[in-house]
């Protein structure tokens, strides 16, 4: 599974958000659009109906929107509508982690309870599906979201000892990849993996004895998942007043 958090600078987080959002904008809105490509100050993102105009632009767009195109895909899509391709991708049934994970788990149980395969299965499934799954846009979108709404199985704690927890979390990202961000936030909030990762599992309210609730998740929700602490311009740079 994904174990690395993006550099948390405002510019890097803004680009990660732009990467996730770009698939739902001009080139991937499911409709033909004549609007100009969106301009982002940073690594460029191909959008608009010109995305499939040439073999080079097709390969570039698919490299951004999938885990990498095959030459046959580039040839067949060049000259067609990028919006139509995105609409077809969004209409595909989600490829979920759980079914393939269960298959690996069955093999692991044959080898014994402590089989290394059991703990490595989420990573095996991720790469297998990244290469072979037909709903590439959904998987790439879920991957972008996983770099923002981070949960990790690194560190030898519960999330690595119980690999099913990471499987369920990844499937939430895939099921909500093209949905409403508010709904996605609610889904991950009630997910045990996020509760364990950001330490609010079993959290209790404050009381007169001096007990205070763990506010780690509330802080992360505001600072990293939503509004942040600094108002940003569209290019990810801080919005200043009088140059400060």
List each model region and its residues:
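Primarily short, surface-exposed interaction patches in extracytoplasmic proteins
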Residues: 72-74, 78, 114-244
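C-terminal motif of bacterial Sec signal peptides marking the signal peptidase cleavage site
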Residues: 24-27
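Bacterial N-terminal signal peptides that target proteins for export
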Residues: 2-15
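N-terminal module-boundary/linker segments of secreted carbohydrate-active enzymes
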Residues: 31-124, 128-132, 136, 230, ...
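Hydrophobic helical h-region of N-terminal Sec-dependent signal peptides
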Residues: 15-21
């Amino acid at each position: 599974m994904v174990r690395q958090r993006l550099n948390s600078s405002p510019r890097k987080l803004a680009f990660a958000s732009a990467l996730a959002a770009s698939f739902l904008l001009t080139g991937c809105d499911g409709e033909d659009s004549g609007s100009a490509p969106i301009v982002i100050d940073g690594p460029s993102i191909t959008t608009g109906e010109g995305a499939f105009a040439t073999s080079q632009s097709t390969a570039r767009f698919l490299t951004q929107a999938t885990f990498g195109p095959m030459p046959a895909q580039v040839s067949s899509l060049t000259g067609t509508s990028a919006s139509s391709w995105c609409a077809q991708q969004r209409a595909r049934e989600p490829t979920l982690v759980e079914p393939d994970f269960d298959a690996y788990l069955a093999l692991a149980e044959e080898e014994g309870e402590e089989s290394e395969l059991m703990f490595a299965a989420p990573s095996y499934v991720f790469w297998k599906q990244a290469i072979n799954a037909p709903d590439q846009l959904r998987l790439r979108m879920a991957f972008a979201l996983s770099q923002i709404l981070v949960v990790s199985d690194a560190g030898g704690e519960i999330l690595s000892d119980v690999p099913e927890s990471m499987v369920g979390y990844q499937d939430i990202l895939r099921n909500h990849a093209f949905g409403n961000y508010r709904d996605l936030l609610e889904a991950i909030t009630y997910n045990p993996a996020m509760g364990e990762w950001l330490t609010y599992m079993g959290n209790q309210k404050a009381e007169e004895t001096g007990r205070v609730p763990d506010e780690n998740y509330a802080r992360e929700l505001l600072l990293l998942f939503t509004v942040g602490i600094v108002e940003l311009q569209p290019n990810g740079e801080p919005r200043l007043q009088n140059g400060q």
